[in-house]
Amino acid sequence: MTTADLLCAARAVKPAAAALSTAEKNRLLEAMAQALLDHADNILAANAADVEAARGVIAPVMIDRLSLSPARVESMAEGMRAVAALPDPVGELLSETARSNGLVIRKVRVPMGVIAIIYESRPNVTADAAALCLKSGNVCVLRGGKESIRSNTAVVAALRAGLEHCGAPGTLVNLVEDTSRASAAHLMEARGFVDLLIPRGGKGLIRACVDSAKVPCIETGTGICHIYVDAAADLQKALDIVYNAKTSRPSVCNAAEVCLVHRDVAEAFLPALAARLAGKQVELRLCPRAAAVIPGTPAGPEDFDTEFLDYILAVKVVDSVQDAAAHIAAHSTGHSEAIVTEDAAAADAFCAAVDSAAVYVNASTRFTDGGEFGLGCEMGISTQKLGARGLRFPVNQKAPGPARQAFAAAVRIPLFPRCRRTGWLSGARRRK
């Protein structure tokens, strides 16, 4: 099937997707989750072929993104069931106002329509995107990377089997099997067929979509995430947080790429950090002040503007909270930043000065995740400010409602007129 034919089929099933009841959507999600487990052998065999073909072609750390295991397939199924358990956003009444002229004005949530997702080598995104689109009454068109085409094909075949077992059209979930740039460009330009485009991947992919798309596009930014260790930090807590944020899964966008350390604790903290990260063979790229304390690779100017997605951490010594915030303003992609401190005033100053989608106090940047926020899997992390910022879920949110307020404690959400809410996540320090 050509991309044009696929888009026609997706558009044709839009009314059916929007008309599904909550019970019907949840039943389909449960069936799709079970189908993933029933077809796990096929999915894992296809994935093994993808991984074998990718070895020597993509970086070893990126193989982790591509790889599936029985546990990861089980996690994909659990994610779909978690989405089924979420409240149905469609039809939610956000506000109601009676006007003096007799009009009753209501704000409600409605589906977007056809959502196209362009992503790279993460087969789990296929299941996550399908689940979120179905729950929100949308049709999805998925276009993954060439490295994962076999895996994605097997996953979509399983999901469609689950849909069709329940009598629903398989075209609720669609996969573009053409992984050429032409197919991606087709989606970017498909006005009248694609109601929303979400790119999820590296800097080049996202920039291409933002620059070229003729359809509405949500920018899901790359993650140059910072952790600032303050003069008033609990240094053991700081070690745990930096270790988790850098090493638990370095190939994901919420992993830390830069550690900023206050000059007053640099001599005590940096040797301990180097020793802790040595076990994971993390390469430290050091500013001159950090290099005067511990050995490592001298940092070049580009190292503080790079999303490494690898066992590499750029380290800089700073003079104050304000100095840290200024560095972040100059180099951050606006994804997730954290401060480790026991000083409430320093934490408040950091949160007020840092302009990113998620800001943490005494917590790992790895918490920027829909599951960790209790909201199920997310479509992506938006770093843009107009209309959509932070964790993104495919429903047309026409006003700030409970779904936004639920995670406003950690995520900056611009409203209109623009205001932001921030807060503390001081209880949980690490994400496993």
Regions found by a protein language model. Name each.
Residues 300-432:
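Conserved C-terminal structural/oligomerization subdomain of aldehyde/semialdehyde dehydrogenase
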Residues 121-124, 128-136, 158, 165, ...:
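ALDH superfamily catalytic-core signature
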Residues 1-107:
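N-terminal Rossmann-like NAD(P)+-binding subdomain of aldehyde/semialdehyde dehydrogenases
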Residues 22-27, 90, 166-173, 248-255, ...:
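Flexible, glycine/charged-enriched surface loops at secondary-structure junctions
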Residues 18-19, 231, 317, 340:
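A structural signal for short, well-ordered beta-strand elements
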Residues 85, 93-236:
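Rossmann-like NAD(P) dinucleotide-binding subdomain of oxidoreductase/dehydrogenase enzymes
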